[in-house]
Amino acid sequence: MNKEQFDVNLVPTWRQGYRFQFEPAQNGFVILYPEGMIKLNESAGAIGQYIDGKNNVSAIIAQLKQQFGDVAEIDNDVIDYMLVAQQQHWIDLV
């Protein structure tokens, strides 16, 4: 799937064994999984906070625009994140 074909009606969910949380020792958001930990940058952490198995990608984009303003890059950043997270097997898109 590429950016042009991406369906923003898909709902991202964290895959079994992966947990998103704020880690004070890392001073940021991380994804924990059995083999280790992934420290996320600020943008990825902001996106990850809205992955709850209920919000579709379109709703996540809308919430981020409400939080940060209608920044043109938000749409592309969220879709890029979803594609990478799916490719890395952090999330499922249903």
Curated annotation (Swiss-Prot):
One Pfam family cited in the UniProt record for this chain: PqqD
Oligomer and partners: Monomer. Interacts with PqqE.
Keywords for this protein: PQQ biosynthesis
Full protein name: PqqA binding protein
Organism: Acinetobacter baumannii (strain SDF)
Highest taxon in the source lineage: Bacteria
InterPro entries the record matches: PQQD, PqqD_bac, PqqD_sf
Pathway involvement of the protein, from the record: Cofactor biosynthesis; pyrroloquinoline quinone biosynthesis
Protein's GO biological process: pyrroloquinoline quinone biosynthetic process
Similarity comment: family membership: Belongs to the PqqD family.
Record carries keyword tRNA processing: no
GO molecular function, one term: quinone binding
Function: Functions as a PqqA binding protein and presents PqqA to PqqE, in the pyrroloquinoline quinone (PQQ) biosynthetic pathway.
Gene of this entry: pqqD
